[in-house]
Design a protein with these regions (language model features):
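His/Met- and acidic-residue-enriched segments that coordinate or traffic transition-metal cofactors
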Residues: 18-175
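Bacterial N-terminal signal peptides
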Residues: 4-16
């Protein structure tokens, strides 16, 4: 429920923020297109991460959490792509991003693990994954967007925070 509310707020902010022309890339500023492209990349990576547990988790709650995470990010990616299309923005996800590194690390950490060892590791990685995206969004991304995109970045943080809180509940089971 919390994730759905955060997701709706985030999508709402994206839907109602004014359409912006592409900004020149100076002083590390992200244009609307670059911001949406970054978020699209992060959604794809998060879906790939979630699918690791969808296919390999032994615990039903872990599988369900992974399915919910994949679905939430899939829905968000689709909405983001529709908004970009409506605004005539061409998304070009960055080649490398924090989420790319996180995905590589997760695959490496989960390699060879099965059963409870896999589940426990994935849940901890999921919590760390979301925490890292929240911190990066707050410290790096928000510092690089103009005031007109701050609501989008803030709603994205809130949306991720709700997912993190849900994952934290599951994490307690594996302590």
């Amino acid at each position: 429920m919390k994730v759905a509310v955060g997701f709706c707020l985030w999508i709402g902010a994206m839907s109602f923020s004014p359409s912006l022309p592409a900004q020149a890339a100076g002083r590390g500023s992200l244009s609307e297109t670059a911001l949406y492209s970054l978020y699209a990349k992060r959604h794809v990576a998060t879906i790939a991460f979630a699918n690791l547990a969808v296919t390999r988790a032994a615990d039903g709650e872990v599988r369900k959490a992974a399915e919910n995470l994949a679905r939430a990010h899939g829905d968000a990616r689709e909405k983001l792509e529709r908004i970009a299309t409506d605004r005539h923005l061409t998304l070009a996800p960055p080649e490398r991003d924090t989420s790319s590194v996180l995905l590589e690390q997760a695959r490496s950490s989960l390699d060879g693990k099965v059963g409870r060892a896999f589940d426990s590791t994935w849940v901890n990685l999921a919590h760390n994954w979301l925490s890292t995206l929240i911190l990066d969004n707050n410290r790096v991304v928000k510092a690089q967007v103009g005031p007109e995109l701050q609501p989008v970045a803030q709603e994205h943080t809130t949306w991720l925070f709700h997912q993190s809180a849900d994952m934290d509940q599951l994490r307690k089971k594996f302590k």
